[in-house]
């Protein structure tokens, strides 16, 4: 079964083809970083217009890379949410139109399910059940995963997501867009221990997160009369260390509370080198194992959507009887259901 995946939830246009017999045949991603850099963040209208321009060409490029014809597609999967409403509608309308023309099923896919399942694309994938740590610009969640569509929320951020905290703190430090990766790169040049920053909710006893107070602590540092601009790399390093410590502590607590020994880390922040090293060392000491997607699949991409669509189609999920453009800008992952069995 060959499934075309389309991702347009925010500022990346991603297209991929996954074959249940041969694996990932090809995928292409266009990032809009240059488009939004002048504004210091994503402009939804510009994002939607760029998806419209890029999507047809990316589909052709992906088909060429996969050595595949449109007529060989068995299903189409698209990101239906959560995300920017206009951006989601671009992908949804394209997918439904193409599905109607080809007379193939069209499957709406949850964006976070795509991230969560992306480590299963690796050569040595984790088996169910496992704990998943989803860390991105919009979400920080811990889930107990027992199968495709079987997700139980263990904890989540009560305010800013980890990636959002990285981006907002980068702005406070005067870094460019996208701020999170630039802050992480700056932290590589800094020394930890110079600034005493809080670890919010580290000892709360539950599995929830909070990062807004950490961001405020950084603001207080840079607003103080004693602040020196030459210390910015050290402050970035201490900020990153605080976020990583909280993420690791909560992930380990989730493993202990569930009795599971497998941890999956997904989302853009999951590519952070410091986070990976800390999680690798911590889980090894506990006799557990951590799994990650390939670095290129940590950020938004069509491969994870095609893969999730293929898993759901193989389990019996079908598209609607009639074409319907369905998007859900707000869509809790815990509300997602298992694929309908045939």
Curated annotation (Swiss-Prot):
What GO molecular-function term can you cite, just one?
Answer: N(6)-L-threonylcarbamoyladenine synthase activity
What reaction gets catalysed by this protein? Answer: L-threonylcarbamoyladenylate + adenosine(37) in tRNA = N(6)-L-threonylcarbamoyladenosine(37) in tRNA + AMP + H(+)
The Enzyme Commission number assigned here is 2.3.1.234
Location relative to the cell: Cytoplasm
| Any one GO BP annotation for this protein | tRNA threonylcarbamoyladenosine modification
Say yes or no: keyword Phosphoprotein present.
no
Instruction: Kindly indicate whether the keyword Cell inner membrane belongs to this entry.
Output: no
Cofactor, how bound (note): Binds 1 Fe(2+) ion per subunit.
Provide the residue positions that the database annotates as binding substrate: 134-138, 167, 180, 272
Q: Which UniProt keywords apply?
A: Acyltransferase, Cytoplasm, Iron, Metal-binding, Transferase, tRNA processing
The UniProt entry, under Gene3D superfamilies, shows:
3.30.420.40
Binding-site list for Fe cation: 111, 115, 300
Q: Which cofactor is recorded for it? A: Fe(2+)
What superkingdom does the record give? Answer: Bacteria
Listed GO CC annotations? cytoplasm
Q: What function does the entry list?
A: Required for the formation of a threonylcarbamoyl group on adenosine at position 37 (t(6)A37) in tRNAs that read codons beginning with adenine. Is involved in the transfer of the threonylcarbamoyl moiety of threonylcarbamoyl-AMP (TC-AMP) to the N6 group of A37, together with TsaE and TsaB. TsaD likely plays a direct catalytic role in this reaction.
Query: What's this protein's family per the entry?
Result: Belongs to the KAE1 / TsaD family.
Its recorded name reads: tRNA N6-adenosine threonylcarbamoyltransferase
Provide the species name. Answer: Aromatoleum aromaticum (strain DSM 19018 / LMG 30748 / EbN1) (Azoarcus sp. (strain EbN1))
